[in-house]
């Protein structure tokens, strides 16, 4: 029996993070069809409204992933999204991996850092989640900035242990944010 996961809205100072709906497909298509945005993603470059609708449906099924749409409080148009990989996708029960994309019209305004911090706080309400991870290409300066602002720590791994990006086999760097009340002396 499939577990039903409710995508609860999360409200920050400037944003509402909530489930995407089919009416958001054109905004998601605009974001993920942008060549510069798609390059950083391990996903594909979106080409059609039907692909955007499939993407939204996939995130709402909450089997492998959950998608939170990012909306400014004063607008009904999605400006980005955050993807949360669930254990069925990642194979890891005590961690969640995040991925995200933001419309280029809203970059360098702190929206993604605000959203990632809110998602982390929300996820850590579940006591079974001990860490949240990001996998970032080492030349993705905007994502590296989000990781730093959101208190993620770089994990130094040998090159042979690094995950490879599906798209082109480039190694990605791992960043981790641990549950605030985790005692690191017990983790050794």
What function would you assign to each model-found segment?
Residues 1-35, 67, 71-188:
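Acyl-donor (CoA/ACP) binding surface of acyl/acetyltransferases
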Residues 48-50, 63, 166:
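A short hydrophobic/aromatic micro-motif that marks alpha-helical segments and, especially, helix-coil
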Residues 57-69:
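A short helix-loop-beta-strand connector motif used in the catalytic cores of GNAT acetyltransferases and
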